[in-house]
Structures are given as C-alpha cells and as structure tokens.
Amino acid sequence: MAKTIAFDKKARRGLERGLNALADAVKVTLGPKGRNVVLEKKWGAPTITNDGVSIAKEIELEDPYEKIGAELVKEVAKKTDDVAGDGTTTATVLAQALVREGLRNVAAGANPLGLKRGIEKAVEAVTEHLLKAAKEVETKDQIAATAGISAGDPAIGELIAEAMDKVGKEGVITVEESNTFGLQLELTEGMRFDKGFISGYFATDAERQEAVLEDPYVLLVSGKISTVKDLLPLLEKVIQSGKPLAIIAEDVEGEALVTLIVNKIRGTFKSVAIKAPGFGDRRKAMLQDMAILTGGQVISEEIGLSLDTAGLEVLGQARQVVVTKDETTIVDGAGSKEQIAGRVSQIRAEIENSDSDYDREKLQERLAKLAGGVAVIKAGAATEDLKERKHRIEDAVRNAKAAVEEGIVAGGGSSLAQSGTVFDSXALEGDEATGANIVKVALDAPVKQIAVNAGLEPGVVAEKVRNSPAGTGLNAATGVYEDLLAAGINDPVKVTRSALQNAASIAALFLTTEAVVADKPEKAGAPVDPTGGMGGMDF
C-alpha cells in the first residue's frame, strides 16, 4: 500500500488535530457534573456512557495523520485503565494540555528534547510528592467513598466496600449482568472452579442435583483414569478410613467410572468424580494450587507418582466439597498456611512479569481462589444502560483496589493543581525549565475541565484551588470549597500518578516527532452495476 509522509510542523499539527478531536469528545465526561456521550453501534441499540476509555475506543478518524494522533491518545487512556481501572479522562485531559503547551513552545523555537527532559523531571517530582502525601485506606467507609465516586453512585461504592471486606484485598470481585433490576452481592466461600461432576449419578441430593461431601479426601490426578486396577489399591485404603473421596482428574472414564457409580448407588462408598478445570499448562498449575490448598499432592508421571502405588499421604483434605453439574467448591482446605502464602507470592510475581492481559486476568483469578475468595456483584438495569452500568462497576472495583494498594489523595483535580509548587523550575535551565513550566500549566487542566462541566469559570476555580491549603478544593457537586478528604472526595494515588505519567509519556512523543508515515487513503472504486450487466454496453 502507498504511503504518505508529513514532516516537521505539518506532521505535529496533524497529530494534534487527532488528539484534540478525541480529547474534546472525552473531556465532557469529567467530574460529578460531566455529561454523557452516545456511541452508535453497528448492531443493536446505541451505548450511553461517561467512561473515557469506552468513548476513546469508538473514535476512528478519516485523515491518516489525525487517525495516528487519536490512536496515540487512545493508548494513554488504555494504559491508565489497565494499570488503575480509572483516570482515563484525566489522562486524556492532561495529555491534551501538555501537547498544546509543548507544541506552542516548539513553534517558538524551543528544543523538543530539552522540553522532554524538563517534563520528565517535573513529573517525577510530582509523582514522588503524591506518593508521600497519600493517606492509607483503612476503613470500609473510605473504600465506599472512593468506589462510589468512580461509579458515580454511592450505593455501588457501599456494595464494593462490602465485597472487599468479605473477600479481602486479594479476593476476586466479578461483575455479572442480572435479569432483575438493582444490585445483588453473592459470596463464595473457598475455592470455586467451573467444572462439575462427570455423571449425575454422583449427586447426593437428587432434587438439587448436587453432591455434598463432608470431611472428604481429595485425589488430584493430572491424567485420565480409565482402568479400575490402578484405582483399586487406593480406593480400598479410603474405604477403610470411612471417609468420602473427591477425585479431580483430566477425566474419569470406562470401568473406573462405572465402579465408582455402582459403589455410590449401592451405598458402599461415597465419592464424586470431577473434571479438572483449564487446559494444558494452566490445568497443571490449577491442580497444583488445589494440592497446596488441600495439603495433598498431584499424582503425575512427570514427578514419578503413579496411582497404583499411591497411599493416603498423597491425598488432600477439606472440610467440605460441594459439586453441581457446572461447578465445584472446595471449602476450608487442610493445606499449610506457609505453603499457601508461598504459592500466593509466586503467582503475584508471575502477574507482575506477565505481558498478556488475558494471562494476568487468569493468574489474578487463581490468586484470589487461594488467598481470599470470590464475590459476584450482579447488576441489573434497563437494556440500554446495562452494559454501561456493568462497565462502571468494574472500573469502580479496580479503583477501590488501587486505593487500598497505594492510598488516596484529595480528588476533584486539586491534588494535581496543588502539586505545581513541589518542583522548582528555577533549579533547571533553558528548555528544561520551560518543560517543567509546561507541566505546571497542565496540572491545572483537570480542575479547569471539572469547573467547565459544572458551569463555573475555570480560571477563577483553578486559581482558588491552587492557593488553598493542601487537601482543600472544589466540590463540584455542591459548588463549595472544602476539605475534600473529609467530604469523601478522593482519588487513588495509583490512578492520579498513572494518568500523569502516561500523559507525559505520550506528550514527549508528540513533541519529539519530526515525521509521520501513514497509509495513503484509498480512492473509492467505481460503483458496481446493481443489475449485474456489463459496464460500457448499451442496448
């Protein structure tokens, strides 16, 4: 495909037009009085949202240079959302302000690399200040306030705080769409995975189609079990102990399955066969998690353990195992706390080193099942609002977790506006000092935009907030200047610093760009004759 190339001012201005088109659509949603944006879908009803990253994803521009500019800002929103779950609109507003001020200085003759260094030094100083100023989140009320602001609904904040209180900060909180209106919270005790019994004959409660084993042994096998002679020696030992047995394996089939079912029906021996969750390496890892949770071992040829020689010492134990046709829950495994803590640390390290969003999500689920528990928030709303509400709750959950992780600062853009005094641009020289001043100007952008959306004069509000004591700012919902932390208006530090760092990173890229190579727009082909006739033929 042919390419089109733009240089110098033309290249940067093209990128800036794309950035502005996207930022102008996103920034109207900032703050408690932010507006909504309607997104047209190819199929189905339009989506109504005030979520920055959702709006950014939908914007596709025609001009090739503008398109690249918009894509770069989408990356800012996406990275901030990935790291912190919120702050996408703040990041976009900051990026727009940094680029606007930066390009003005480049046009006036400043060296882009000097500006870049100044921006980086100023951002580093602000980040350090925010982390030092952060207040730890210790109470349920603080979590509720943080999540409530993110979701734009105090009731959602309270429900998320309740869920976090129950499952702990490592626990998984998932959000599902519900057919009924309102919000519901479901809590799962123990480790749950989405595989059930292999045969309905294992059910101990025929009406509920559920098998409940009290104080069972847990046998974990990485392969298939098909012959009864491999299983028999271990079965005899378990029967002598008088305990039921839960078998979790890749599959249980043939005569081994028939033997278990016949013994269950006759009442000789209570057991249940369950398919192991996942595939390949993920299945092996999950079986190992279960082994550590229950204090057992995974029987696998890879480590030299075979089923026919295994004794009771390789079996795990739990207070209860509940199995339905779709899922299994292991309650109160007998594994040692030290081993579980070691496994949790290992999974946490894997999460930090993973580049894949999908892998990170799956590792996070495994971590929660070992360390905390699982809470499900079921959200119901009118059809056109349902997806948007679910997305808002998911963002609020991640926001609350970010607050617990690094603490909170005053919200409403005030912590950024008041951070302009923490670095001394006079200590820098030339273009580096100019770069630091660009950051100082841009730090006011979020509070100014919140003021605009609330129908207030942005310059006056920014000036007043900047000169107020630390933590004091504008409550845009009421129009009152007050102690924002005391009023429950706060932002997680992780969200605020991620927004600034990602915005500065993309702004530096804009300023140091000297050429843009883009695909040349294709000319539309000649229209096809709808009658199917031959072109150019006249009859």
UniProtKB/Swiss-Prot annotation:
Per the record, the major location class is cytoplasm
Which EC number(s) does the record attach to this protein?
5.6.1.7
* Location in or out of the cell: Cytoplasm
Q: Which GO terms describe its biological process?
A: protein refolding
Which residue spans adopt a coiled-coil conformation according to this UniProt entry? Answer: none
Q: Which GO terms describe its molecular function?
A: ATP binding; ATP-dependent protein folding chaperone; isomerase activity; unfolded protein binding
> What reaction is this protein's catalytic activity?
ATP + H2O + a folded polypeptide = ADP + phosphate + an unfolded polypeptide
Pfam families named in the record: Cpn60_TCP1 (PF00118)
Q: Report quaternary structure and partners.
A: Forms a cylinder of 14 subunits composed of two heptameric rings stacked back-to-back. Interacts with the co-chaperonin GroES.
- Function summary: Together with its co-chaperonin GroES, plays an essential role in assisting protein folding. The GroEL-GroES system forms a nano-cage that allows encapsulation of the non-native substrate proteins and provides a physical environment optimized to promote and accelerate protein folding.
Under which name does UniProt file this protein?
Chaperonin GroEL
Query: Which organism is the protein's source?
Result: Tsukamurella tyrosinosolvens
